[in-house]
């Protein structure tokens, strides 16, 4: 197992990461998402983000290093996924996405709530 970058504060099981990709896809189709670190940062600062997704393989890590602390400060749940390429694909863009934010989960509200609960349990460990 490769060492995680310093901004990764907790381990996300693969099963949960797959649910996160599914949530991003569903929210993109039936709700509203923001893609990329600048858009994600703005959504958190404006209080619009319901969940922030951060890729673990971002290089240089400074691109997303501020997001966990900003989310903590604003009370926004956040979760990690292993691949910025997969996150970009789930978000419907042809390039990788270092991060994304769920603004409106659309038809995936239950999945959003389930993921937030799982993240809270992971962070409590």
From Swiss-Prot:
Q: Where is the signal peptide?
A: none
Which UniProt keywords are given for this protein, alphabetically ordered?
Cytoplasm, Ribonucleoprotein, Ribosomal protein, RNA-binding, rRNA-binding, tRNA processing
Kindly list the biological process annotations in GO that this record carries.
ribosome biogenesis; translation; tRNA 5'-leader removal
**Alphabetized GO MF terms:** ribonuclease P activity; rRNA binding; structural constituent of ribosome
Q: What Gene3D superfamilies does the annotation carry? A: 3.30.1330.30
Instruction: Please classify the protein's predominant subcellular localization into one broad category.
Output: cytoplasm
Q: Which InterPro entries match?
A: eL8/uL1-like, Ribosomal_eL30-like_sf, Ribosomal_eL8-like_CS, Ribosomal_eL8/eL30/eS12/Gad45, Ribosomal_eL8/Nhp2, Ribosomal_eL8_arc
- Give a yes or no for keyword rRNA-binding in this entry: yes
Give the protein's function.
Multifunctional RNA-binding protein that recognizes the K-turn motif in ribosomal RNA, the RNA component of RNase P, box H/ACA, box C/D and box C'/D' sRNAs.
Q: Which HAMAP family match?
A: Ribosomal_eL8
The family line of this record is:
Belongs to the eukaryotic ribosomal protein eL8 family.
Record-given protein name: Large ribosomal subunit protein eL8
Q: Which organism is it from?
A: Nanoarchaeum equitans (strain Kin4-M)
């Amino acid at each position: 197992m490769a060492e995680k970058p310093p901004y990764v504060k907790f381990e996300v099981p693969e099963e949960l990461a797959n649910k996160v990709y599914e949530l991003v896809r569903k929210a993109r189709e039936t709700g509203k998402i923001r893609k990329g670190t600048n858009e994600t940062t703005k959504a958190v600062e404006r209080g619009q983000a319901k969940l922030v997704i951060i890729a673990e393989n971002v290089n240089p890590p400074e691109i997303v290093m501020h997001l966990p602390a900003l989310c903590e400060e604003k009370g926004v749940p956040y979760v990690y996924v292993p691949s910025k390429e997969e996150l970009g694909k789930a978000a419907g863009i042809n390039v990788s996405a270092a991060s994304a934010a769920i603004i409106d989960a659309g038809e995936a509200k239950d999945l959003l709530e389930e993921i937030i609960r799982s993240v809270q349990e992971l962070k409590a460990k």
